Each structure stands twice: as structure tokens, then as C-alpha cells.
Amino acid sequence: MNTLKRLIILTILLSLLAFSFPSTCLFAAPNPPQKNVIFMIMDGTNSDIVTLSRWYRGTDLQLDKILVGGTRTYSAQSAITDSAAAGSAMATGMKTKADYIGMNPDGRPVLTVLEGAKLDGYKTGIVATSPVQHATPAAFTSHVLNREEFGDIGEQQVYQGLDVILGGGAAWLKPKSKDHVKNDDGMLKTKEVSREDGENLVEIIGAEGYDLVLKRDGLLKRKGASKLWGAFAEEDIAYEMDRKTLKPDEPSLAEMTRAAIQRLSQSEKGFFLMVEGSKVDWAAHKNDPVGMISEVLSFDDAVGEALKFAREDRNTMVVAVTDHGNSGLTLGNQGTNGDYKNQPVEKFVEPLRKAELTVKGAVSQLKEDHSNLKEVLSNYGLGNLSKKEFCAMEDASKKAEDLEDEMVKLMAKRANLGFTTHGHTGEDVFLYAYGPGKPVGLIENTDIPRVISKYLGFSLSSGEFVSWYVDGAEFYRERGFDVKIEGRTSKNPVMVVKRGDEKLRFPENKDFYWENGEKVRLKSVNVYDGQTFYVHVEG
């Protein structure tokens, strides 16, 4: 009995002793878990092409497993948005005007969710199958009034300090480059694409510590945690269906997504990654159902890579959405009016499955003498043409664009598909999401970056972020400085600020200024819209 009492007393004393010490003495304080966001955008995709792609593949899509709601896509000025305004809305949490990139409706630069994540210590990256300077990736990484300003966009991206950039757009990194394209007659010609300011951004990319890769093999072989820039095409990366045979040196969207995640996930705090499947939109503008399916399925494979990581990681939010509809594609057309209730799936997908290339890929193989026209048509799945149909193709083949138009019209007819437009459409679109903090329900496109920033622990509407950029001339003049813009109409304008012996020089699109000859790095790039220099001023 005495022994039992002693054991009870000893146990109580040990318990009291343990609780008398701070827990940090007994256990190491755990590091806060990583928080990651993979924001995936399938450009220009309406609901019917998602349905058609599912039927074409014959199995459920990765996207189907994470459908949670819908998104409204209108812009500040139109019921039907363009990609610049849509991308900016999803990057900044603010509706804006057509062509504006990272700008509010008044034309002032606004911090993006990617920039906010970078400032908060997260690793950041973008992936796209378009040139990385194109509207959607640009909206997360730059600030211009016109989406066509690829030179300014590309320069800002280089100086933004992102950790991973993968896609096309090599042409806008070099002072002079040449791209081989076909003219309207289907003849090869050399088109010169170059930076108008003459700067060699490839050299800057190297100086900024990036591992630069130009081919698929280089991407797949490279591992590590260093910064990574992949420029795999002068302009856009080939459609996935074409890439496999015509451009095998270019990586798939899924491969780029996997590589980006591998690099970014080595961050202790976490990462933000934006992935765009850019070219559903391009095929939709052409009314090419084969190209549209190619890119929807390519995007879905990339979603699979993101979900695989997120399910293992358990601290990753995945959001997937399209920025707007395009083409008004429908399963069913005027030809099915009288008997729409007796249309088996095969009537829609079998004509499409005969295609081995998209219309762009097929026509790119047309010889100068057009002697292989039948082969070109067959590569697009158009065999067994009537004499009337083939004559129409021969007449159209004088211009590549006309031939493409005739080919997609015949394919749509054979596959019982309808198209209402070659432009964007204004419907609500599907919202897909997975993981902690994910958005659900029918929401505005501007809600997405707010949900993301909240999960990552910052607010895009905070006073610091809202007032991040100031009118440089106004700010410094109020403090007694003389201000002038050197080279206002040149391609390399500089804001010069002077007071006594103090002289500051702010070059456009760069993340630094010169103070009496010494370079001072900034947390963001300087933005010039042709009239006003916007800068960030510490404190």
C-alpha cells in the first residue's frame, strides 16, 4: 500500500514539474506550414468545349473532380471582356478597361496578387503556352495601358524578380530576332521581331541569376532551387496536338507546370504560381474544334499535375477557371434541328478523332506548289471529300487563312457543331477549386485574388498595397525637387529628380534607380505610361 501511494505521489510530482516549464523547453516550436497557391487559367473556354473534350477523351476530366461554382467575367466597360481586363481583374481584384494590364480604370498601376505574394516572402512563378508577354501572364507581372506593349511587358517581367517563368516569347527578350512564318499565299517568309529599345534582356536574365533553358530536354533534366527562365519558342508554343510531331523540342503545359512546382515547392514559406493554358482561346477565335480540344486536354493534364502535388502536400490551394468564353461553340447546329434527340455521342466526336493535327498545324505543312493538299486535309481529318468540297479547298488554298477557314467550316459541319462568333462571349464560366480556403459558389472574377491573398496572409485592399505606386513627379515636386522626363518620346525614358547636389534617375520598367551614380534596388518596377512616371517610395 505504501509503495502504491509513493508511485501515485511521484507521478503527480512529475506531472506538475512538466507543466511548470514552458512548452518550448520540452518541444521545438514547429515551423508554420507552407501555404501554396496554384492559380490556373484556361483562356477563352466556354462550357460546351469542356463537355466535348470529355466525350472526345472518353473519361472524366481532372477538372470535373473539383467543380465548385461559377465566375462572372464582365469588365468595367463591357458585358464581354477582353483577356487584358479579365486577367487584370483576376490579378488585382479590380475590374478595369479593355487592353489595360495591371492598371485600374483610371490608368494607375495596381499591385497584383503575384506581386503581393512576392513582397510577403513567397516564391512566385508564371507558366504559359503563349508568349509570356501575352495578356494573361502579363496581367500578373506588369503594368501597361496597352496589352500590345510586349517590349515594356517583357522588360518589367525580367526586373520583377520572379523565381520561375516558363513559356514562349523569346523574340521580345532580344534586340533582333527572326521568325519563319507563312504569308497569305502559304509561302515561307522571314519576319523580323525585335525589341524596339535595343536592350538584350537575355543578358539581364543571366545577370539576375536565372537558369535559362531553351529546349524541352533542358527543362526535364534540370533540377534544383535556382531561379528558372524557360523561353521555348520565339512566339507561342505549338498546340499540344501539333507539338508532339512538329515541335518536339517544346515542352507540354503539364511538363512546364510540373517543373515550376518542383522549383517553387522548395520555398520554406510557400509559393504562388499562375499557369495559363493560353491557346484554347486562339483555336476558338479560328473556330477550330480540334485545336480547342487539344488545348483543353493539355490544360486538364496540367491540372492533374497541380492536383497530384496538392493532394500530397495538403497545404496547397488550386484554383482553375477560364477568363471568358469564346466562339459560342455548341454541340448541335442547324443540321440537328429536326432530330436533336437522336444524336449519339459518336456523331460529334468521331469526325474530330480522325484529325492528327490542328488546322494550324495541318496547313503549316502545305507545300509551295500545293501538291500535298489532300494530305494536308487528311491530317485535319478531312478525307472522302466530294468533288465540290475539294474544289472549294483548292480555291481557298491560295491564301493560308482562307484554307483554314474552309477546313474548320467543313469539320464543324461533319461534327454537328455550331459557332456563333469568332470573338469572345459574355457568359458566366465554370469555377474549379481544391484545397484549404478555396472559393466556392457563383462569384466575381475579382473575388478570386482576394480569396487567394487572404489564404496567403495579406490583403490586396490594405492601405499599403492600394497606395503602393505614386505619381513620381508629384511626389518629388512636393518635396522641393526639380523633375523632368528625359527621352520622353524615346524607347528608354528616364525620370530625373534633382535637388541641390542630390540627383535620382528612375529608368522605365526597371526595379532600381540611380542615386548620385549608385544603383539602389526597389521592391517593384518603375512604370511609365507615356505621361506619368509611377514609382514606389519606401516609407
Residue ranges, per PLM feature:
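Bacterial N-terminal signal peptides that target proteins for export
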Residues: 2-11
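Bacterial N-terminal signal peptides
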Residues: 10-22
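Sec/Tat signal peptide C-region and signal peptidase I cleavage site
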Residues: 23-27
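A post-motif C-terminal structural segment
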Residues: 35-36, 45-50, 55-88, 97, ...
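Glycine-rich anion/phosphate-binding loops
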Residues: 103-111, 148
